[in-house]
Design a protein with these regions (language model features):
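Domain-core detector
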Residues: 1-205, 213-230
Length: 230
């Protein structure tokens, strides 16, 4: 039986050799590339899981999670590191000497990590590589959402201006690629944190590809054309 240590070691090797991840981290000037980073990490872990998936046959979600938990927490840590770098860049852009808050390993993040094991255990047929990658990517994108939520709330509590945008991804992967009313209801553009929170901006269902972006400043002039905070 494959061990959690073996899976984690294989995942770390793939992370270290992935040039795209290194490039995304170097160019993290905000949250615009955060979902891409989370998806890329998800693909790397999915490759590792696919290589040992046959050993999960007959195991329940709890047993599978016991093997994958260290790697799923490593995935969280990688995405959280990107988010912290992105948040620092946002404060720098706004001329604010503030420290970025790292997204905590919350109940929501932990639950979505566990859903990876549930998805594997409950599948009637072996999951495809794409299916595995989507499961892990969802867990990673939840980290991005939590980071934006945490830092936007902190900025609002300090009396800073915030601008939050949630963009609908165009399809609902969970419902046969038909328009997703749940996501469309949560898409929008808000100039204060509380309105975004009340609208469900930071929520995400499995298969959701919506993108959330966030900027902060003492005073703001948002240009839709430039897409930057001035």
């Amino acid at each position: 039986m494959v061990t959690s240590e073996q899976v984690l070691a294989a995942f770390r090797r793939r992370l270290q050799s992935n040039k795209k991840l290194a490039g995304l981290l170097r160019s993290a000037d905000g949250y615009g590339k955060a979902n891409d980073f989370a998806k890329t990490c998800g693909k790397e872990l999915a490759q590792v899981i696919a290589g040992v998936a046959s050993e999960f046959a007959g195991l329940d979600a709890k047993a599978i999670y016991g093997i994958l938990e260290p790697s799923l927490k490593e995935n969280y840590a990688e995405v959280a590191k990107f988010c912290k770098t992105a948040q620092k860049a946002i404060y720098r852009e706004a001329g604010l000497g503030l420290g970025a808050l790292e997204p905590a390993y919350s109940e929501v993040i932990a639950r979505n990590a566990y859903r990876v094991a549930e998805g594997i255990a409950e599948a009637t047929e072996p999951l495809t590589l794409e299916g595995l990658a989507n499961l892990v990517a969802h867990a990673g994108m939840t980290v991005v959402d939590t980071s934006i939520d945490t830092n936007a709330e902190a900025a609002a509590n300090m009396g800073l201006e915030t601008h939050i945008v949630r963009t609908y991804d165009g399809v609902g992967l969970h419902n046969g690629k038909n328009p997703c009313k749940w996501c469309m209801d949560r898409a929008g553009d808000w100039t204060d944190y509380q309105s975004a929170y009340d609208a469900g901006c930071f929520e995400r269902h499995p298969g959701c590809g919506c993108k959330i972006d966030y900027h902060v400043g003492k005073t703001r002039t948002w240009s839709n054309r430039a897409g930057t905070w001035r």
